[in-house]
């Protein structure tokens, strides 16, 4: 039976929930097959793609990290990395926010082809630019363009966990 994301999947959890012995599967790295659960057209050239696994699996990442998508486009294997824009407090899914690049092979393919229900391979998460490994009492971010997505993830995490930053 396939798992369809539901409202219960979107509940906010704490980091201690990741250590719950009742949880049987935690994905923290490696290559996995994920299903596109939702596509949100943010603007005419920016979309957010949300992914989940067929079975409930806690997807743990540090806010600011990225995943690498492995796609087959025009018969060729293509890999591109995108920062996760969602918060790890949403336990069974993650999102990437992608701006369409005029001549971008992958960004255009995602915008034109990826639909809810489609399967793709994902590697990761990885990356050292995150707020868990580099805690601070106060932060100031200046970002623009693709630099917004790691900041989105961090800000959402701090909000969801009532962080005092």
Please provide the spans of the model-predicted regions.
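Ferredoxin-reductase
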Residues: 15-119, 123, 137
């Amino acid at each position: 039976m396939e798992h369809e994301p539901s409202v219960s999947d979107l509940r906010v959890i704490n980091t201690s929930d990741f250590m719950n012995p009742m949880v049987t599967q935690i994905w923290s790295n490696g290559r996995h097959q994920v299903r596109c659960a939702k596509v949100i057209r943010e603007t005419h050239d920016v979309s957010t793609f949300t992914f989940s696994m067929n079975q409930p699996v806690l997807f743990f990442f540090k806010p600011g990290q990225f995943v690498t998508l492995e796609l087959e486009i025009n018969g060729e294997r293509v890999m591109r990395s995108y920062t996760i824009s969602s918060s790890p407090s949403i336990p069974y899914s993650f999102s990437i926010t992608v701006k369409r690049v005029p001549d971008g092979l992958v960004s255009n393919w995602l915008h034109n082809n990826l639909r809810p229900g489609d399967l793709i391979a994902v590697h990761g998460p990885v990356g050292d630019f995150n707020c868990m490994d580099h805690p601070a009492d106060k932060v100031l971010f200046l970002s623009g363009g693709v630099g917004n997505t790691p900041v989105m993830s961090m800000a959402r995490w701090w909000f969801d966990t009532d962080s005092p930053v």
